[in-house]
Each structure stands twice: as C-alpha cells, then as structure tokens.
Amino acid sequence: MMATYEGRYTDAQALRIAVVVARFNDLVTGKLLSGCLDCLARHGVDTSSNSDQLDVAWVPGAFELPIVTQTLALSGQYEVVITLGAVIRGDTPHFDVVVAEASKGIASVSRETGVPVIFGVLTTDTMQQALERAGIKSNLGWSYGLQALEMGSLMGVLRSATSAS
C-alpha cells in the first residue's frame, strides 16, 4: 500500500526553530523577519523575547548565512532553520558570486545535516523588487515561516514512520 507523508501547520508547538538573518540590506531583511515571525506566532510558535522555541541569529550578509546555519543545524537543538537575506544586483559580478555561494552553502547544510533549511534569500535586480517581496505587495517572510512549519512537521512524520518500520 502506498504511503503518503505530509507536514501540517498545526504541529508548531512541538518545533524548535532557528532563524538566521543577513544584516546587509536590513531594510528588506527586517521586513522578511517580521513577516516570518508573524506567521510563526499565528500558528502557535512562541516568538516572545524569552521564547524557548525560537532563536534568531544575525549575520553580516548573505555570504555568511551557510556557516551559521550549519552551526545551528549541527547543534541538535532545532527541527528546522530559516535563512533570510536579500541580495540586490549591482554593477559588478559580486551579486553572482554571493548568490551562488549562499545558495550552494545553504542547500548543502540541509543535505549534510538532515535538518530542513528554508531558503529565504531574495535575489532581485532592484531594491524596489526586494521591497515588493518583503511587504509592499506581499511578504515572502510569511511564506518562509509556513515552509518551516510544514517541513519541521513532515520530518517528524517521516522519522516516526521510518523508525516504526
């Protein structure tokens, strides 16, 4: 018989979540973080300053996201890690280098640790595009929060299913 595995948004109280936020372009990343925290709070995650369920780490920029994400994932304290950043194209190839290394690094953390890592790094051509995605039109931070809840729950379901068989 075929098994179907899905994560739910209602298992939030059982999750420990880390959010790693790039400070560079903090006008954008701060809005992403606000949207993310709003989503998590509305789904039952304690987002208060004395929360035992959520930690937020700030890094200088998107390039530094992978190393801190890896450290948190390897700690064994979190079911899911969310990364938030904003890389905006400029006049030099720097954009391409930062985006490539951040995305490869973040993806490898998830594969190597088995901890879901949500890729919440905006890559846009202009500040206007980034702001539109961080709250002017919609806030993708909310979506990243939902993805974290779903993946954290799904991994719990999968671990239970595979340990029972």
Swiss-Prot record:
Source species: Prochlorococcus marinus (strain MIT 9303)
A cellular-component GO term for this protein: riboflavin synthase complex
EC number: 2.5.1.78
Active site feature: H94 (proton donor)
Name of this protein: 6,7-dimethyl-8-ribityllumazine synthase
Family per record: Belongs to the DMRL synthase family.
Lineage top rank: taxon: Bacteria
Pfam family, one: DMRL_synthase
GO biological process: riboflavin biosynthetic process
Residues reported in the UniProt entry to bind (2S)-2-hydroxy-3-oxobutyl phosphate: D91, T92, R133
Recorded coiled-coil stretches: none
Catalytic activity field: (2S)-2-hydroxy-3-oxobutyl phosphate + 5-amino-6-(D-ribitylamino)uracil = 6,7-dimethyl-8-(1-D-ribityl)lumazine + phosphate + 2 H2O + H(+)
Keywords: Riboflavin biosynthesis, Transferase
Database matches in InterPro entries: LS, LS/RS, LS/RS_sf
Pathway this chain belongs to: Cofactor biosynthesis; riboflavin biosynthesis; riboflavin from 2-hydroxy-3-oxobutyl phosphate and 5-amino-6-(D-ribitylamino)uracil: step 1/2
Residues the entry annotates as binding 5-amino-6-(D-ribitylamino)uracil: F24, A62, F63, E64, A86, V87, I88, F119
Broad class of enzyme this protein falls into: transferase
MF-aspect GO terms: 6,7-dimethyl-8-ribityllumazine synthase activity
Presence of keyword Zinc: no
Keyword match Transferase: yes
Function: Catalyzes the formation of 6,7-dimethyl-8-ribityllumazine by condensation of 5-amino-6-(D-ribitylamino)uracil with 3,4-dihydroxy-2-butanone 4-phosphate. This is the penultimate step in the biosynthesis of riboflavin.
